[in-house]
């Protein structure tokens, strides 16, 4: 669980964020599929009436919302991956090395 010299970032926490983001993305996709399937099941069932329609409509809204979370989660995962890669390179950057010489 190392940090990065010159940056207040905990490598272990960054790795944990990567793992949690991947799990969250997977869970959102699974939840969206289940919600969509439930709405379709209700639509094809014998359950009728205003309440059934409202339940189905709510489920469809939830499925759409969950679907709209997929791309932002993918962007979030990419950002965390980029952060991890760039933090690992930070100490080798020439500007960082120059700053270390000026401000030891």
Curated annotation (Swiss-Prot):
From the Swiss-Prot or TrEMBL record, state where the protein is found. Secreted
Q: Name one GO cellular component term.
A: extracellular region
Signal sequence extent: none
Source superkingdom: Bacteria
Q: What does this protein do?
A: Virulence factor that is important for the establishment of infection in the host. EsxB is required for EsxA synthesis as well as secretion. Mediates together with EsxA the release of S.aureus from the host cell. Also inhibits host cytokine production and thus modulates dendritic cell-mediated immunity.
User: Family per UniProt?
Assistant: Belongs to the WXG100 family.
How it assembles, according to the record, is:
Homodimer. When mixed with EsxA does not form heterodimers. Forms heterodimers with EsxD.
State what protein this is by name. Answer: Type VII secretion system extracellular protein B
């Amino acid at each position: 669980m190392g940090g990065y010299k010159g940056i207040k970032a905990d490598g272990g926490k960054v790795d944990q964020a990567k793992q949690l983001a991947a799990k969250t993305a997977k869970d959102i996709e699974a939840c969206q599929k289940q919600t969509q399937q439930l709405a379709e099941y209700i639509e094809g069932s014998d359950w009728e009436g205003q309440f059934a329609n409202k339940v189905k409509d709510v489920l469809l809204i939830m499925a759409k919302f969950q679907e709209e979370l997929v791309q932002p989660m993918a962007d979030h995962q990419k950002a965390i991956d980029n952060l991890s890669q760039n933090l690992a390179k930070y100490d080798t950057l020439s500007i960082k090395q120059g700053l270390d010489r000026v401000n030891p």
